[in-house]
């Protein structure tokens, strides 16, 4: 360095040092400036100070911290690092823990409910649940699930019955450019309001993109005792904008592309996680996968599109439903959420929705034990169906009285010529005025009610955790013996109520065979069916087997008293009197007409 350069640098340093010294404000000027700043600070409202401190200063403080600056480069660089914190938003129904990482709901506890181990019931928890907006900017793919949001408040919020509260988390991009997640909760609700607001993002989101993709993934843990049954009743549901509610497969891995959609649901047996879009999702996709895990029931994934408009502010109002699959509660939410509950198909669905469920809810109002409610429900059903039972039994009595004459016809005609044998039987039925299907039709009319309960009780949330007698939980099986899984038949326990139901059915079958005089294959089929039902129903809820046990017992008692009131000799006399009536005065039943037409067709075929 030459002398001139050294002299120039020295003079510059002297000038800078002198300017700092001579331009320093006096103590009086410093005091006046401090008073002015204090006055301005006092005029700021607490909300303005909180907003400024929590949503902007915190971000600036983060950037000034000792975090490695190389991690904070690129779009949303200041939000790529941070420490995860949880803010709790709860009421008397649910407790939602909201994470600053991703601004997502990290876990939800349904208050007042327990899992099969007796622990507080948590719908989902931990990092196995992901939730975020996906888009690209400046050639970089962004997923807000991986970024850190700034909470409006870090204090937990407990909402009382009549109150409501909200929590805002902000993801800053730059000044006046951010994404807000706003959660809101009312005092008595299973719904957690959720609104996404984008501010100044029209120049941030890549010009080629017209949507934000909302990605939601969850691995839902086991909550019920029977993992296999819970898996078979867990899947994803959705409602399209045309009002059609549909589901993915419950028994295998499945996926589906969706059009405009109102809501999606990650449904387990007795609880659902629903995301409702007030303005609908423009498109989307759902996927359900069964993992090889002893703790996770199923893995759910959804990618739902939110239309993005090139404007300063976009708002996407939504809501979560985190709660039980109880028909009345789901129906109160609107949007057909109750259609997630499998009430059966065809007439069984209508029986359960408009007869069984209203009567059950009426009995529930008496605050009886649920075992007693099922008992009363069974009695009421038997009273309503008793006319059909009586008619069926009278028809069976007529066939029993005719059996000796039918045996004579069989001996006379022989069993080789079945066509002629059936013709002779029809002639006898016509003369006696007996409809051979008269005993079957009333029983067939009762079958929809029997099948309806097969769907009703296994999906009835009200039975969950309710005990009766030795049954600790009416919503699952009551095992008295447990053992390793037996291949082929796939059972690892014995249900006491299922045994009682099977025994009652076998006794009823024996009595009916004795009364009706059943012989041959029909006699043994009657004993075979209850054994099949045992293996089918052994893992079904104790409440269902309890109902079938009561139903079989009451049917047996009713049949016994009807049998005592029916006089076979009187019926025989009526049949003989009917035989003496002229043929023209006897009206043929539709069954007899069809059988006669069938016989004539058979005769024509045989002649050819």
Residue ranges and their predicted role:
Residues 42, 58-59, 65, 110, ...:
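Intrinsic disorder/low-complexity segments
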Residues 1-56, 98, 187, 194-202, ...:
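Helix-loop-helix
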């Amino acid at each position: 360095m030459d002398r001139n350069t050294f002299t120039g640098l020295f003079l510059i340093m002297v000038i800078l040092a002198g300017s700092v010294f001579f331009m320093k404000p006096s103590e009086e000027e410093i005091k006046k400036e401090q008073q002015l700043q204090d006055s301005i600070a006092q005029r700021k409202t607490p909300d303005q100070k909180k907003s400024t401190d929590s949503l902007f200063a915190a971000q600036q403080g983060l950037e000034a911290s000792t975090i490695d600056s190389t991690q904070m480069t690129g779009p949303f660089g200041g939000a790529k690092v941070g420490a995860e914190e949880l803010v709790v938003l709860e009421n008397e129904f649910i407790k939602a823990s909201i994470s600053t990482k991703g601004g997502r709901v990290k876990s939800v506890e349904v208050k007042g409910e327990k899992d099969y181990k007796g622990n507080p019931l948590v719908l989902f928890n931990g990092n196995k649940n992901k939730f975020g907006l996906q888009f690209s900017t400046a050639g970089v793919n962004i997923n807000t699930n991986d970024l850190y949001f700034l909470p409006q408040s870090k204090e937990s919020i407990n909402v009382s019955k009549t109150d409501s509260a909200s929590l805002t988390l902000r993801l800053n991009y730059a000044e006046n450019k951010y994404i807000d997640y706003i959660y809101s909760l009312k005092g008595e609700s299973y719904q957690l309001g959720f609104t996404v607001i984008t501010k100044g993002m029209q120049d941030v989101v890549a010009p080629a993109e017209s949507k934000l993709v909302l990605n939601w993934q969850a691995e839902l843990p086991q909550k019920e005792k029977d993992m296999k049954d819970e898996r078979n009743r867990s899947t994803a549901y959705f409602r399209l904008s045309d009002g059609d509610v549909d589901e993915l497969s419950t028994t295998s891995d499945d996926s589906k592309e969706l059009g405009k959609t109102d809501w999606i649901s990650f449904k387990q047996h007795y609880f659902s996680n629903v995301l409702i879009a007030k303005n609908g999702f423009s498109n989307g996709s759902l996927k359900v996968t069964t993992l090889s895990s002893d703790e996770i029931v199923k893995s759910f994934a959804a990618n739902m599109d939110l239309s993005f408009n090139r404007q300063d502010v976009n708002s996407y109002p939504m809501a979560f439903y985190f709660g039980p699959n109880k028909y009345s509660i789901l129906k109160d939410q609107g949007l057909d959420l109750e259609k997630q509950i499998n009430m059966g198909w065809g007439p069984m669905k209508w029986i359960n929705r408009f007869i069984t469920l209203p009567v059950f809810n009426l009995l529930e109002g008496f605050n009886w034990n649920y075992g007693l409610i099922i008992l009363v429900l069974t009695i009421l059903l038997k009273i309503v169906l008793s006319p059909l039972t009586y008619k069926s039994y009278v028809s069976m009595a007529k066939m029993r009285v005719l059996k000796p004459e039918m045996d004579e016809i069989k001996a006379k005609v022989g069993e080789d010529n079945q066509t002629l044998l059936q013709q002779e039987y029809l002639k006898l039925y016509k003369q006696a005025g007996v409809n051979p299907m008269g005993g079957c039709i009333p029983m067939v009319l009762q079958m929809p009610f029997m099948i309806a309960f097969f769907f009703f009780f296994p999906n009835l949330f009200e039975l969950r955790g309710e005990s009766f007698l030795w049954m600790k939980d009416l919503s699952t099986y009551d095992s008295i013996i447990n053992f390793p899984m037996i291949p082929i038949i796939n059972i690892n326990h014995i249900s006491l109520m299922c045994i009682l139901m099977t025994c009652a059915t076998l006794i009823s079958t024996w009595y009916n065979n004795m009364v009706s005089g059943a012989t041959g294959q029909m006699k043994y089929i009657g004993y075979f069916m209850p054994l099949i039902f045992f293996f089918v129903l052994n893992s079904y809820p104790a409440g269902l087997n309890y109902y079938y046990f009561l139903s079989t017992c009451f049917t047996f008692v009713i049949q016994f008293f009807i049998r005592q009131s029916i006089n076979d000799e009187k019926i025989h006399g009526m049949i003989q009197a009917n035989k003496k009536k002229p043929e023209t005065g006897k009206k043929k039943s539709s069954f007899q007409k069809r059988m006669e037409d069938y016989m004539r067709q058979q005769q024509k075929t045989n002649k050819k």
